[in-house]
Swiss-Prot record:
Biological role stated in the UniProt entry: Specifically methylates the N7 position of a guanine in 16S rRNA.
Transmembrane segments: none
Keywords of this entry: Cytoplasm, Methyltransferase, rRNA processing, S-adenosyl-L-methionine, Transferase
InterPro entries, alphabetized: rRNA_ssu_MeTfrase_G, SAM-dependent_MTases_sf
GO molecular function: rRNA (guanine-N7-)-methyltransferase activity
Name the UniProt record assigns to this protein: Ribosomal RNA small subunit methyltransferase G
Enzyme Commission no: 2.1.1.-
Lineage top rank: taxon: Bacteria
GO cellular component, one term: cytosol
Protein location: Cytoplasm
Pfam family, one: GidB
Annotated organism of origin: Leptospira biflexa serovar Patoc (strain Patoc 1 / ATCC 23582 / Paris)
High-level lineage: Bacteria, Pseudomonadati, Spirochaetota, Spirochaetia, Leptospirales
Amino acid sequence: MPEKTIQEEIQTIIPELFPILEPEFDWELVKNFYDFLKRDNEKGGFFSKNDSEKILERHILESLIFVWKLKTTGYVSRETNVADVGTGPGLPGFLFAVLKKAPQVFLVDSQKRKLALLEAEITTGSLSKVKKRVEFIYARTEEISSNFDVVTSRAMVPYPYLAEVTTRMVKQKGILCPFLAQPYQDLEKETEVLSNNGFVLKKEILIPELEFVGKRHIKILQKNSLPKKGYPRDWKEIVKETKSKNG
């Protein structure tokens, strides 16, 4: 029996949603990215042993649906520049680059071990087709000053402190889109952190399509003003507060 294509594998997992996703992405690139993650996983230390057996559903598919949600809700287009912080081997950020109508993508990570392998694959390997629309930034997020339309992150800094770490990266009226699991319960603290760093909560996008891996949602945080005086704080102060909040 011939091996299943990546489209067939994904259709088995999400049979009702796949016909909607299929026309949005370049599936040859999706397959090549999946193959890269499997091939270089041990070298790059991309995933835990348990997750290494679930790369397609827990990482590729989860990221594809995140990207699709932001595109279909109008937050990402060909004219957008998107920065994905703490991207590791390009998750979820690289999947923006495999949209048929792809934005300009900036992959950000201070650790070169994982991301440099993806850069090599794009430069001279199976992902060279996206070379002109993907750029790499090896720097600490809190040290980057830029003007990105959209900044995304899956698991770099606990929410809502991601807003403080990334505020210098997001342009005025730009958006920060954390990809989150369980809802954040301390609404007073959320409002305080967002307000101190110039953000307001514009929208929350639930992702019932990902219930097979757990609860997932996206916050749409719009940067409406400059941070208040004294913000963003030093990285050590932010870390200290996140640890105290998490007990």
